């Protein structure tokens, strides 16, 4: 299995780069084969004000309905009559105060947020593993509301609603309205998308990545750089926008043609006046490393905590997949059904869609999906893969494009996703193995 996966990976990388050079306008006589040329020609459509208002309303309505559903599920699985009258905001908060939601740093900050650990025997700044942007946003909103919990929900709700607009806009301008509608529907029905409403980074990161894609499509490089900087302050994967932006810049500027025509100096001028803004993006990661260094004296202290407290060490993706398969082959439990099977299925789906994308999808999106998936599947003891892959957003682009002319298959997928959503959401609210 390891040899097969590595072989497929190497072949994919090789074919991807050949197509990349072809799309930078390699002269016809140098092209290896028509196989490496894009076989699709999607007709994008502009995002309208009506689209913006409609998607904002839809996203907000969905968040309200999901929160209402969470209360109903809580009341149904408990003694409905004895709990309904006494149900309070604190009860609602506790429904969503699970997994990483309990660890955010808005109130205490990194310095004052410590725990005594068994492996060191002293207080450690364990929560340095969490990036700072989401807590900073919560702290900002706390100026306007009295509760950190309310501030956190406000950040998540606003980020989700705005993110849906950028998501829809990016897909519509690239693929057209039909695929945009299907992509958004698949995203909303993704079995782990309820995490968008929690006190976690999912919604904020989703908003920033979607906005990054939207402005990369429009070649607004300064805006992309600023958004990417925020994204890399939100999660380490935010830095991927740098690669996505460079891919789009090099393809759109037709680098090889410019070299062939003796316009390399013109390209350099264009690069250093426009694309140079993309290099703002890694600053977010550097700020995070600086926080680690300032607090502990080690810029990579978060990796120590990940290893010793959360049992995460960096590994090659094939080792992660092999570990998941070993867990699946063991005794069946809720962990097997809610963590390991979904993670294996998601990996297979992502790999299949990447292969499908080689000749059919924009390279910037396949580059993001490949690197994002590799990062997520390059750790040991991956227990939150379903949640992490929520922001592998080209998954939804590619699936919608693939099923755009297959109405029955699309409807079956929507039905299956909705069913699994209900199962996973209920498990999350009732203490199941959903992280």
Residue positions per predicted region:
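Membrane-lumen/periplasm interface segments of specific transmembrane helices
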Residues: 62-79, 238, 242-357, 364-369
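Membrane-interface transmembrane helices that cradle and orient dolichyl/undecaprenyl
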Residues: 172-178, 212-223, 253, 403
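Transmembrane-helix signature of polytopic, membrane-embedded enzymes
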Residues: 147-151, 162, 167-189, 207, ...
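Signature aromatic-anchored transmembrane alpha helix within multi-pass, membrane-resident enzymes
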Residues: 278-282, 405-434
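Transmembrane-helix motifs of polytopic, lipid-linked glycan transferases
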Residues: 136-140, 154-174, 349-353
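Short hydrophobic/aromatic helix or loop-helix immediately within or flanking a transmembrane segment
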Residues: 98-146, 319-325, 376
């Amino acid at each position: 299995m390891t040899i097969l996966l590595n072989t497929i990976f190497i072949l994919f990388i090789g074919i991807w780069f050949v197509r990349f050079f072809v799309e930078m306008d390699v002269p016809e006589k140098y092209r290896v084969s028509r196989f490496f040329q894009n076989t699709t020609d999607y007709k994008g459509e502009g995002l309208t004000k009506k689209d913006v208002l409609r998607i904002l309303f839809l996203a907000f309505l969905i968040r309200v309905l999901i929160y209402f559903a969470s209360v109903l599920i809580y009341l149904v699985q408990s003694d409905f009559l004895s709990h309904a009258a006494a149900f309070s905001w604190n009860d609602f908060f506790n429904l969503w105060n699970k997994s990483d939601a309990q660890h955010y740093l808005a109130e205490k900050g990194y310095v004052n947020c410590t725990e005594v650990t068994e492996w060191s025997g002293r207080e450690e700044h364990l929560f340095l593993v969490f990036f700072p942007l989401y807590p900073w946003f919560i702290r900002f909103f706390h100026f306007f509301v009295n509760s950190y919990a309310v501030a956190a929900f406000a950040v998540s709700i606003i980020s989700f609603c705005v993110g849906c607009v950028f998501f829809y806009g990016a897909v519509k301008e690239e693929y057209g309205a039909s695929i945009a509608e299907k992509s958004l529907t698949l995203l909303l029905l993704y079995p782990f998308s309820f995490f968008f409403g929690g006190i976690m980074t999912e919604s904020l990161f989703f908003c920033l990545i979607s906005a990054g894609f939207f402005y990369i499509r429009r070649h607004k490089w300064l805006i992309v750089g600023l958004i990417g900087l925020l994204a890399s302050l939100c999660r380490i994967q935010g830095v991927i926008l740098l690669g996505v932006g460079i891919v789009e810049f090099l393809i759109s500027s037709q680098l090889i043609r410019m070299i062939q025509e003796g316009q390399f100096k013109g390209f350099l001028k264009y690069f250093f006046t426009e694309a140079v803004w993309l290099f703002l993006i890694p600053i977010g990661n550097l700020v995070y490393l600086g926080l680690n260094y300032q607090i502990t004296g080690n810029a990579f202290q978060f990796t120590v905590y990940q290893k010793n407290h959360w049992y995460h060490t960096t590994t090659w993706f094939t080792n992660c997949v092999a570990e998941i398969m070993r867990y699946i082959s063991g005794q069946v439990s809720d962990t097997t059904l809610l963590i390991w099977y979904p993670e294996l299925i998601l990996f297979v789906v992502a790999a299949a869609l990447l292969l499908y994308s080689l000749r059919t999808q924009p390279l910037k999106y396949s580059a993001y999906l490949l690197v994002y998936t590799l990062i997520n599947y390059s750790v040991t003891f991956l227990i939150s893969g379903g949640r992490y892959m929520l922001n592998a957003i080209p998954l939804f682009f590619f699936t919608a494009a693939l099923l755009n002319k297959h109405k029955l298959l699309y409807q079956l997928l929507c039905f299956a996703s909705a069913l699994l959503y209900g199962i996973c959401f209920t498990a999350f609210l009732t203490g199941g193995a959903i992280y």
